[in-house]
Structure formats: C-alpha cells, structure tokens
Amino acid sequence: MDKPDTTLKIRTLGRFSIYVDGKLFTTDWPSETVQQFFCSLLSPLDLYITWDRLCRSTLETPVSPTARRGLEELYIMPLNTFLIKEFGFNPLIASDKGIGINHSRIDLDAFNFNSTVLDGLKLLSLGSQQAAFDKFNKAKELYSGSYLPGMPGKIIANTRKELDSIYRIANKAVIDEV
C-alpha cells in the first residue's frame, strides 16, 4: 500500500531518528541487523551501494548468486516488508548494480550536509569565494555530530569517517575566511 503523501525526515548526524510526516517514529525494528542494513543504505557518499560492497560488508563474502540470495532473505525482504508496513512506501531502489535510497520523499540530513559541502567546493573552484563560504557556513549548521554515532557496520563507519573529514574541511574553510 503506497501512501503517496508520506515523507520521511531522517536524522543521522549526532543521532538516529526518523520523522514520518513530522511525527517521531518510535516503532521497533524487526531486528538490529535490519536497522543497521537500512542505515548503511543511507550513506550520502554514493547514489547506490554495489551488491559486492553490500555482500562484503554484511556477509563478509564477495557477491555471488548465493550471497545475493542471502542479502534478499536476511535483509532486503524483511526491510521491504517493514518499510511498507510502517511508512506506507518503500524508498529502496534496487538495480543490477546495487541498491540505494529514493530521495524524492526523504529529507536526509547527511545527504544535505554532503551536498552542501560539495556545492561549496565547486563554487570555490570556480572562484566564487563568498558563495562558497556561505555554503560552508550552511554545512556547519547542518552538521550536528558524527554520522550515526554508536551504530556498528563497515559502511556506516566508513561514512562516519568520511563525513567527519568533510566537516573538518568545511570548518577550516570558514575559520580561514574569518
């Protein structure tokens, strides 16, 4: 059952919380591993995460038909069922290459932060210093802490490290401007 008006606001910087149409989502996840898998897919560093990367990070094996089936059975099917039941739609997009999140109905703080810093770097490379520093200041406002603090997982840990590094770049640019 698709609820076309449902929107999600997902906070991953400094904490993990989901708001459904403005209300805090408090239902229990099917399992910690399904929640962790979903959070891995929220990484703003890639449009999608390849099947090989997912298999290696969650099952610790290269992609194969058996590994893909394992991902489907252990993570994707329970997650799809949960998302449709709780949110009224499934924001996952799967292809032959991998799986990602459809951002059209999701406001994801880490995605907004990452995009804002990248826009600032692009503006800086084009010589638009003031516009770039405005973007970096906006990014500083968006960054409310480390990505999914305390949440385990290889993709999450790599994303956390990368976003912390990007934050330091934006912060240094703002400090250097002052």
Task: Set out the residue ranges of the language-model regions.
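Intrinsically disordered, low-complexity protein-interaction/activation regions
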Residues: M1-V178
